[in-house]
UniProtKB/Swiss-Prot annotation:
Organism: Streptococcus thermophilus (strain ATCC BAA-250 / LMG 18311)
Binding residues for substrate: Y111
Protein name: tRNA pseudouridine synthase A
GO biological process terms on file: tRNA pseudouridine synthesis
Role, per record: Formation of pseudouridine at positions 38, 39 and 40 in the anticodon stem and loop of transfer RNAs.
Active site: D53
NCBIfam families reported in the protein's UniProt record: hisT_truA
UniProt-listed PANTHER family: PSEUDOURIDYLATE SYNTHASE, TRNA PSEUDOURIDINE SYNTHASE-LIKE 1
SUBUNIT field: Homodimer.
Family matches, as InterPro entries: PsdUridine_synth_cat_dom_sf, PsdUridine_synth_TruA, PsdUridine_synth_TruA_a/b_dom, PsdUridine_synth_TruA_C, TruA/RsuA/RluB/E/F_N
Keywords: Isomerase, tRNA processing
UniProt GO MF annotations: RNA binding; tRNA pseudouridine(38-40) synthase activity
Length: 248
């Protein structure tokens, strides 16, 4: 078998998430259906680097799959891209060794989260950013975001019900900025892995800090206490983007 690595992007609005689910539309299923046609009716399993949730978007999701023979990567990319639905784009495909695994090979993920703050809101962006109508302090959020950088136990920023036992992760970069063109707040996080709804919980906490309803020290309090109840709310997934995955 020959292994292929593909970088894909997608608009997550009409998907239940990346992972295949019964009676629901998923990115994995759509790509597997297309590969089934390209592979003469033989099923192909797609493995993703990240299992994005319903409504979450991606610019740089990475997948891998195996085919029984070697094909020209660009021709394969073109065939897969043109036969996938319009809300999925196959950015690139390359041949990789059998040891490569999209999820388990060592990598750094970067997520971005967009917030349309203030009034009036932009209804055209309702599927691509969350609206937050209250005043925000960029300086306070930037200061609090720096507290997330480093290796920590992120239990307090994880959604309940996760089956992952080891909740220690390393965040190498965390920032908050304002996009000059849109005026949206951009929350960016890079790290070696993220827990279930971790990014959305961190953004919810930073928004409360930016609005003055939590102190900057709340981030440290949540990390040390590992108490989810002390963090901010889970923001909606439509503002979240899997921006990039870099492999070592």
């Amino acid at each position: 078998m020959v292994r292929y690595k593909a970088t894909i992007s997608y608009d997550g609005t009409l998907f239940s998430g990346f992972q295949r689910q019964p009676n629901a539309r998923s990115i994995q299923e759509e790509i597997e259906k297309t590969l089934l046609r390209l592979n003469s009716g033989t099923p192909v399993t797609v493995h993703g680097a990240g299992r994005t949730d319903a409504g979450v978007h991606a610019y740089g999701q990475v997948i891998h799959f195996d085919l029984p023979q070697e094909r020209d990567p660009e021709k394969l990319r073109f065939g897969l891209d043109t036969q996938c639905p319009d809300d999925i784009d196959i950015v690139s495909i390359e041949l990789v060794s059998e040891e490569f695994h999209a999820r388990y090979s060592k990598h750094i993920k970067t997520y971005e989260f967009l917030v349309d703050a203030g009034r009036p809101k932009n209804p055209m962006m309702r599927n691509y950013a969350i609206h937050y109508p209250y005043p925000l302090s960029l300086a306070l959020m930037q200061e609090a975001a720096m507290e997330l950088v480093g290796t920590h136990d992120f239990t307090g920023f994880t959604a309940s019900g996760t089956s992952v036992e080891n909740k220690v992760r390393t965040i190498t970069q965390a920032s908050v900025s304002i996009d000059e063109k849109t005026g949206f707040y951009v929350f960016a996080f890079s790290g070696n892995g993220f827990l279930y709804k971790q990014v959305r919980n961190m953004v919810g906490t930073l928004l409360k800090i930016g609005n003055g309803r939590m102190p900057v020290s709340q981030v440290k309090t949540v990390l040390e206490s590992r108490d989810r109840n002390l963090a901010g709310p889970t923001v909606a997934g439509n503002g979240l983007y899997l921006k990039e995955i870099r492999y070592e």
